[in-house]
């Protein structure tokens, strides 16, 4: 694929847009459990959860995998990373969310940015040899377009944070201005996560705070739910 600064920017704006039809609007990644308990009750308390989510789950999973895709020298390694990021997601709803959003994003990305590695990944996912995951899809596109590794990590983490903030605005709820304030705060948390992820040993992938995963597992048995995870 031809890559210029403009094509890289526009590709990120498209694929990292919270409006991309991947189904991200239907996932809370566990914050709905904290909302049900009353731990999250306003924009400030949601911000505490979001900062933890970025520092823990996104930093030790998605960010590490994106970096590893950039450094991979074979498609076999990409396949291993797909299996690993899927297997390390202990809560079933989180595994399912990764698969469904990954498949939808892969379909869009493969049509718009048909890089050989992305075409291979689409074929493997279609054949159910691999599961599909948004972090790997974006890493393959970003690498093909010569997006800098740190920028690719930041864009994915920021996009995920944006989707969660939009979901929280309607679920908690709180106002749009409070949401914009959180988006600004999230930029600082994402910047820190990008730096921290560069120093994480690959063997530490998936080292997530147990409380976060427990809340994600408990969500499945919640009596009333707005979100699928």
Curated annotation (Swiss-Prot):
Pfam families: UreF (PF01730)
Localization of this protein: Cytoplasm
First-listed, main subcellular location of the protein, grouped into a coarse class: cytoplasm
Molecular function terms from GO: nickel cation binding
Annotated GO CC locations: cytoplasm
InterPro entries: UreF (IPR002639), UreF_sf (IPR038277)
Key words, A-Z: Chaperone, Cytoplasm, Nickel insertion
HAMAP family documented for this protein: UreF (MF_01385)
Assembly notes: UreD, UreF and UreG form a complex that acts as a GTP-hydrolysis-dependent molecular chaperone, activating the urease apoprotein by helping to assemble the nickel containing metallocenter of UreC. The UreE protein probably delivers the nickel.
Family according to the record: Belongs to the UreF family.
Function, as annotated: Required for maturation of urease via the functional incorporation of the urease nickel metallocenter.
Protein name as it appears in the record: Urease accessory protein UreF
The organism of origin for this protein: Corynebacterium efficiens (strain DSM 44549 / YS-314 / AJ 12310 / JCM 11189 / NBRC 100395)
Lineage: Bacteria, Bacillati, Actinomycetota, Actinomycetes, Mycobacteriales
């Amino acid at each position: 694929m031809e890559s210029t600064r403009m094509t890289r920017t526009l590709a990120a704006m498209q694929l990292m847009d919270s409006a991309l039809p991947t189904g991200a609007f239907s996932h809370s990644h566990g914050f709905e459990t904290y909302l049900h308990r009353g731990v999250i009750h306003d924009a400030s308390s949601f911000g505490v959860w979001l900062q933890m989510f970025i520092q823990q789950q996104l930093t030790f999973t998605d960010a590490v995998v994106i970096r590893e895709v950039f450094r991979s020298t074979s498609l076999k390694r990409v396949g291993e990373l797909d299996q690993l990021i899927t297997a390390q997601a202990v809560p079933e709803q989180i595994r399912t969310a990764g698969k469904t959003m990954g498949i939808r994003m892969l379909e869009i990305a493969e049509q718009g940015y048909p890089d050989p590695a992305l075409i291979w990944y689409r074929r493997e996912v279609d054949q159910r040899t691999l599961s599909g995951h948004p972090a790997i899809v974006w890493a393959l596109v970003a690498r093909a377009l010569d997006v800098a590794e740190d920028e690719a990590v930041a864009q994915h983490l920021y996009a995920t944070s944006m989707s969660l903030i939009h979901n929280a605005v309607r679920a908690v709820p709180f106002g749009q201005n409070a949401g914009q304030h959180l988006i600004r705060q999230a930029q600082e948390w994402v910047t820190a996560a990008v730096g921290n992820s560069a120093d994480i040993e690959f063997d530490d992938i998936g080292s997530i705070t147990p409380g976060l995963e427990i809340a994600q597992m408990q969500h499945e048995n919640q009596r009333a739910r707005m979100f699928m995870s």
